[in-house]
Amino acid sequence: MSIANLQVKLSRKLNIALTPKASKYMDRRPYPPGEHGPQKIRRGKMSDYKQQLLEKQRLRLQYNIREKQMRNYARKAVRKSGNPADNLVQALESRLDALVYRSGFAHTMPAARQFVSHGHIQVNGRKVDIPSCPVLPGDVVAVKTASRKIPAFVSAMEELVARPAPPYLERLEDGLSARLTRMPTREEVRVDCEFSKVIEYYAR
């Protein structure tokens, strides 16, 4: 099975669109894989553990990170002062690859991760090739000038108008640069997940 088809299958299983292709497919077939129509209803109430596991999987796949990374983020969120769920949101959303995606420079989170790893992204004018690199308020994330003629970035530039930046990001005049103005709130993040369930899962 191709990666694209696997992402579609995972999207249907978890009821989240991980890619644009998955979103279109789910519009046509809004039910899990293995079921042959919307008329089939699954019976039985999901246990607390299964709910927590499901939300953890949904969150991990939306940010395209490994289980070990997610566990570390959750544990740090609990140890840090403040609301653990809010802490988790901010830690994940301030990752460099997440901000490349939110800024509209990539069509998917995996693509954003790849762009960073391949050295196409700068933070405050310096190349950074670590997708998990934390970005701080005031930092500017940008596509390198030498990379802006790559078709993927040309396409992203053409589609920026249709993809408004979230309120905690400010797109700069050149289009392929954005500033993190502040840390996001849970309500502002475009992620389909009950963050509190994820915290509960790792607190077991």
Language-model regions, residue ranges each:
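Ferredoxin-like alpha/beta domains used as RNA- or RNAP-binding modules
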Residues: M1-S103, I130-R204
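Beta-rich strand-turn-strand
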Residues: A106-M109
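Short, well-ordered loop/turn sites that connect or cap secondary structure elements
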Residues: F115-V116, V135
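Glycine- and Gly-Pro-enriched alpha-helical subdomains that act as flexible
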Residues: G119-V123, K127-D129
